[in-house]
Amino acid sequence: MFTGIVTDIGTVEATEKQGDLHVRVSTAYETGGIDLGASISCSGVCLTVVDKAPGWVAFDVSGETISRTAEGMWTSGRKLNLERALRLGDELGGHIVTGHVDGIGTVRSIEEIGGSHHIVIAAGPELAPYVAPKGSITVDGVSLTVNAVRDTDAGVEFDLNIIPHTAAVTTFGALEAGQAVNLEIDVLARYLQRMEALRGKA
């Protein structure tokens, strides 16, 4: 479990196909304090540490995970938003994030307004019921508040405001229009939608 508050930006240093894809990621984390088997969110994807050394950690990424995450994410040189798993007593600064990607979004536009970045992201119809104004959503592992929502023929578009600090401490500072991003809906929205669906069958 995570909070969507990024604590490091890692870089994919190397990949190797070993059945699953073995991915080594550089990090500023003190890896001596990271146990093998620990969970780390990598741009919104919960992965298990399978190897480590000073300056890097490694993960095995399944074909299923690769197929459900943003295109180009698992390539050398790619920057990743990193967050270690939430521990009892930690501050919950964002919202509850599971590290399970619900869908892929596409950055439609980025506009700088007063130092902040106004970003529009498009997603498919399967996510539309779960995106609400002033609700929470996780984009590439970052907990964000939705400013506005528009239903479209292709699904849904929503607006985000990225303040300078968030852009500086995440990969959003280098985000480009047309780029694919990992999306995770608010777990509370997921449960509420399920309850509403069951109520309709009663």
Where are these regions (language model features)?
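Conserved loop->alpha-helix
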Residues: M1-A202
